[in-house]
Amino acid sequence: MSDYKKTLNLPQTAFPMKANLAQREPEAIKKWEAANACAAMVEASGSEGTYILHDGPPYANGHLHMGHALNKILKDIIVKSRNMAGYASWYVPGWDCHGLPIEHKVEQDLKEKKKSLPAHVVRKLCREYANKWLDVQRKEFKRLGVLGDWDHPYISMDPAYEAVTAGELAKFVAAGGVARAKKPIYWCCSCHTALAEAEVEYNDHTSPSVYVRFALPDEGLKKVFAAADPARAHVVIWTTTPWTLPDNMAVCLHPEFTYALVEAEGSQYILAEELVASCAETFGWSEYTILDRATGERLEGLKARHPFYDRQSSLVLGLHVTLDAGTGCVHTAPGHGREDYDVALKYGLEIYSPMDDAGRFLPAVEFFAGLNVFEANPKVVEKLEEVGALLQKGKIRHSYPHCWRCKEPVIFRATTQWFISMEKNDLRTRALKAIDEEVRWIPAWGRERIHNMVEFRPDWCISRQRQWGVPILALLCEDCGEAWNDPAWMQEIAARFAKHPTGCDYWYEAELKDVVPEGLACPHCGGNHWKRETDILDVWFDSGTSFAAVLEKRPELGFPADLYLEGSDQHRGWFHSSLLVSEGTRGCAPYRAVLTHGYVVDGDGRKMSKSVGNVIAPQELIEKFGAEIVRLWVSSVEYREDIRLSDEILGRLVDAYRRIRNTCRFIMGNLSDITAHDLLSLDRLQPLDRFALDVAGRVHERVQQAYMDFDFHKVYHTLHNYCVTDLSSVYLDILKDRLYASAPHSDERRSAQTALWHILCLLLRDMAPVLSFTAEEIFSHLPESLRGPETTVFALPPLAAAPYLLDEGTRDDWNVLLAVRGAVTKAIEPMRREGIIGHSLDTRITLFVADELRQRLEGLHTDLRAVCIVSQLHLEALDRAPQAAYRDEEVAGLAIGVEKARGEKCERCWIYSTELGSDASHPALCPRCTAVIKGMES
């Protein structure tokens, strides 16, 4: 027997079957860096305009976690897909470097020494710490295959950035939008600083629950309730923060609620009528009588007595009082609550909050001096019992605010802070209008979420009592304590930041005379003794100015951005602060669209936690699977929800990746001997190959649209199904005979190769944004004669699908043929199961077809036998079909007869022929193979 295998055109390619991703990916990264692939990608783009994705800066602290990986890969997919679609898109990564977490780490290292060090020394250590982790994270991001301007990122501690941040605050001051006031704000007693809404997390917490009676000896009570006895009367409050009772200034009632005067156990009590029954049960009153009723409005101005201090607590009115729980009478401590503060302003009550930065009561606070607020809780309860003011005590488990950094419970504390007003210049109204009318929110529920946050948020507390950040440019009068600043002066100081080697360290290092304007007198008291403000800006103001520091300053970018993309927690963070800063100083949103993703959870849907032990680090996955599989995972999930991750999930994706890779490898293996000169024009392709290009073109359209719509899971599923089903299981399976057994330079083989080349060109463009390493590897293995001048796959120009598409009628006919092919496969299966045949080529098929079906099949002008991968196939009229013929309910007008193929099997192509050996020199070959061999021999 002759060795005819050597005469077959078997696939040949240096593109390896085994990916070895973890080993090969670093080489690809080196290649991208050497070729400046990011610049090459953008420079090759721009035919459709620009697209600006503005990077939300991660915090320069610690190694990357899976949330970082998800976020950066999503951005990378968008930037690459936009560039490859013709939209020039520079990706400028950024880092947020100021703030408490870094200062906290430096504090831990310095311990007690920090207290004696000047601010600029602490700041230098913070800067070094941030720089160290910035470099670590930069390497880790690049390892994920993310292309960007990594050598020129934006960094919030750069002098130019700090100068812009300080300058943006000056613009708010110029517009009258900034005020310094004593208001209750979130305060962390552990970190000794004010907190913004975005820096507060709500967790379950157990608090004391106490019902307290305030004596109401006011004779005016009789004018409201005829049956009242002021000597025995009380108003009852409920609180879960007993430590705030020393600072009580009033009891608040709702003006429209009905309040009852209740007789019980020898005393009289004022409670909201609707809550009397539940309170009686709580207090254990077996009997009680409602003596009279009145609206809260009639009780306004009556004077109660503080439970353990010799002072009055007035009855005041407020619309914030509810009947959801408690008594309908609200303990009011203006130094510890927003509504309490608002009521205090209305009634002229003292904003009383006598505690230090650690939350300890000052020496002047009788009974509780020196106690931390949480230590004071049980002591206050003891005091209430001692004076007979405690009606009931217990515990309550509820959602309570905690510090985002140290995880400790926080308090409301009135301190002097700097605020941006939400009402001045209609900032709130304008921000809400931008949310509703200017910005596209993806998913759509994001609009309502941020709308509600902005609608109900308080004024923005922008000051922090820390050292590592951009200082608030203001001078404090040492004579009267009032603050002074001026927008022009602030801009001048900000300009000095830009020129100083370490930016706003200038504020701490310069002599006082260099920052105080000559001859400046305090406008409040006329004094001229000044000191610098030591508060720094909220880091959310820092990052919220990034549009001004980056988009408006870099010529390759622009304002506003087309897209901000971060986790859903940023509705209250970066999206929120950026909107307020931009709306406040530019009068518009800084973004046209906002896209949010969910959190990464484990395979069971649980939050990743070190304590649970279910944290998965990107570095481990890259080492085990390769970054490419992590990228494929990002593209495969519905990332707008919480995203599950486990080894099992990634294992399934490894299998999917292998199938995609092998499909590409098969295509490349069959292009090894073709040059650009050998490619046929589309009108010379065989009908099957034209249909294959139609399928490829429609897949390309779907994939590109999915990229534009941010539906990356559709990209993954479309490409995977295409490679596995349309290509491997159908088209490539049909092509094998033509590719392997036809004459190497024949039109029928060149037609197949031409189609494969076009398919690969489309596949490369569709894969590259997600499977970046693999696409680059394929690109580097393309035959030299087929390659263009591009240095990277990402610089390939866009390809339109239109030239590949067929008319719908022809496409429908091909789909009918594929349905017939599927029916043939099912008809053959019983003979295969019974061992009568081993392969579909061992069969002869008779298609009994109705006239309409015959016309459709014959109108395709294709080899039906080859499409069905059988040795012989012929058509007969449907009415000649025997009873035993196979019928498929999915294909109308068809019956199938299956029998063993006639003749003998060709040793070269394995197709049966009744004309085997018609040439004596090749007795084991069919006429087709004989002609091919003779052509080779000649």
Swiss-Prot record:
Q: Which residues bind ATP?
A: K610
Which EC number applies? 6.1.1.5
Q: Where does L-isoleucyl-5'-AMP bind?
A: E566
Which cellular compartments is it found in?
Cytoplasm
Keyword Cytoplasm assigned: yes
Function in brief: Catalyzes the attachment of isoleucine to tRNA(Ile). As IleRS can inadvertently accommodate and process structurally similar amino acids such as valine, to avoid such errors it has two additional distinct tRNA(Ile)-dependent editing activities. One activity is designated as 'pretransfer' editing and involves the hydrolysis of activated Val-AMP. The other activity is designated 'posttransfer' editing and involves deacylation of mischarged Val-tRNA(Ile).
Under which name does UniProt file this protein?
Isoleucine--tRNA ligase
